[in-house]
């Protein structure tokens, strides 16, 4: 009888099962929008073929006495129509199922993954192989599988944290900071704690020009826009609390690795509302300096080691899993009190040239207890994927309206509404709106600027990233 292969969870994944709950399913979605309607049969064949190159993705999650672990299975993913809530829970205790799903709607292919398996970079590599297989089968492009496989590297299953960990190189006591009480966004939450998605698409060239005009990177400007939108929602009493944005960092940019498992860290950008002078120019320097300080090579190395140190802590090792779960859950709740929201820059997505004629754009979303923005670009399409448990999101409305005020056209689509919204420079509340067909995901339409409430110029409504802008569009 063949012996089943099992994998330890990487250091970023160890806390994931213990911190899953409510709208924070710890599931993320990566979407590829094709230029033609999806062929379900070709997609199923592509997923089956691609899964063979990522054997640890066919694992199921099990509980050990001291840690969770991945147990390789013979299960195969079944491609289905997109007919369930976005970012819905994947892992349920006691259920024997894969930790990812693939579904489709119209021209869109969605890959949803439980964060235990991988981060955004690993998931995009998997999706690229799926797309290569799909194009090979659907359009007869026989060489695509080989091209993408070579780009993915040879050590997809390795734990990069273990490879680069240096004993004793953890954060010193003087460098550790206690979590602060951050400002929290308010709003009506979905009664079923489901995530609401909003996708905003802008021109890479337009957004990059706006960033350069302000001497900022794409990541810095995006973060500053999020902070400014949150500032507008704060009352006078709220301003005693800082805005704290959590920003994932792709550690592969600092430690070479082709791993398809989790390999990311997190930095926090803290902004004191008292510093705000009514302009982005009073926010961007604070964001820039925060990135500069925390993304120095030595600081990133300390951050990476702090993640890996958990596995090497003897006292933690011998604590039973049941107790670990309780402790980790309590610590996570405390840490969440110190976070306003999250913004993650996945960066520029590229595919082999032969595939480009068949792909329109990519987007990504991450389940969130409050609000998370993920951005990625493909060619001249820069997409901001917003996931939130809030039914209405004035902060996100202002986030996109500020882009419009900067002269950037924004096209919005949501899983909550039957239309998208194109927001052009100069749109004003109270004007008329012209709606015309243009259905994409969810049968959305394209709406011209100027609509009043109920059809507003901006509709009220989710990995590892690259905040430094090394792979920015």
Model-flagged regions — what are they?
Residues 2-11, 105-108, 117-125, 129-209, ...:
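Non-catalytic, low-complexity flexible loops and terminal extensions
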Residues 35-51, 112-128, 197-236, 343, ...:
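Acyl activation and transfer enzymes in specialized metabolism, enriched
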């Amino acid at each position: 009888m063949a012996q089943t292969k099992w994998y330890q969870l990487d250091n970023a994944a160890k806390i994931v099962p213990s911190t899953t709950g409510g709208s924070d399913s710890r599931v993320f979605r990566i979407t590829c929008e094709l230029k033609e309607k999806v062929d379900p049969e070709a997609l199923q064949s592509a997923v089956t073929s691609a899964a063979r190159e990522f054997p640890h993705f066919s694992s199921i999650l099990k509980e050990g006495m001291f840690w969770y672990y991945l147990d390789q299975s013979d299960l195969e993913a079944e491609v289905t129509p997109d007919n369930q809530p976005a970012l819905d829970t994947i892992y349920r205790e006691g259920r024997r199922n894969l930790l990812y799903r693939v579904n489709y709607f119209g021209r869109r292919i969605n890959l949803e993954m439980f964060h235990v398996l991988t981060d955004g970079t690993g998931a995009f590599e998997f999706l690229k192989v799926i797309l290569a297989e799909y194009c090979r089968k659907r359009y007869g492009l026989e060489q695509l599988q080989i091209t993408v496989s070579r780009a993915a590297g040879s050590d997809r299953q390795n734990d990069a944290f273990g490879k680069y960990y240096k004993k004793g190189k953890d954060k010193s006591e003087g460098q550790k900071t206690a979590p602060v009480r951050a400002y929290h966004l308010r709003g009506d939450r979905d009664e079923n704690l489901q995530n609401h998605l909003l996708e905003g698409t802008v021109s890479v060239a337009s957004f990059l020009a706006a960033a350069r005009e302000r001497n900022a990177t794409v990541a810095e400007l995006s973060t500053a826009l999020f902070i400014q939108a949150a500032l507008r929602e704060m009352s006078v009493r709220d301003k005693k609390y800082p805005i704290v944005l959590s920003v994932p960092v792709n550690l592969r940019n600092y430690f070479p690795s082709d791993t398809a498992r989790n390999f990311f860290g997190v930095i926090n950008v803290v902004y004191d509302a008292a510093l705000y002078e009514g302009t982005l120019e009073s926010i961007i320097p604070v964001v820039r300096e925060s990135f500069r300080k925390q993304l120095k090579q030595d600081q990133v190395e300390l951050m990476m080691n702090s993640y890996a140190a958990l596995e090497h802590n003897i006292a933690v090792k011998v604590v039973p899993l049941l107790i670990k779960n309780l402790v980790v859950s309590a610590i996570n709740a405390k840490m969440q009190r110190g976070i306003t929201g999250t913004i993650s820059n996945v960066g520029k997505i590229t595919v082999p040239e032969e595939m480009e004629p068949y792909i329109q754009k990519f987007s990504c979303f991450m389940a969130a207890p409050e609000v998370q923005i993920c951005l990625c670009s493909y060619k001249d399409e820069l997409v901001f994927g917003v996931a939130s448990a809030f039914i209405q999101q004035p902060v996100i409305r202002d986030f996109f309206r500020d882009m419009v005020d900067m002269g950037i056209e924004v096209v919005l689509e949501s899983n909550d509404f039957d239309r998208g919204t194109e927001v052009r420079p100069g749109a004003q509340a109270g004007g008329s709106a012209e709606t015309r067909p243009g259905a994409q995901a969810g049968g959305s339409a394209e709406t011209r600027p100027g609509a009043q409430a109920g059809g507003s110029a901006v509709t009220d409504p989710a990995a590892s990233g690259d905040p430094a802008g090394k792979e920015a569009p």
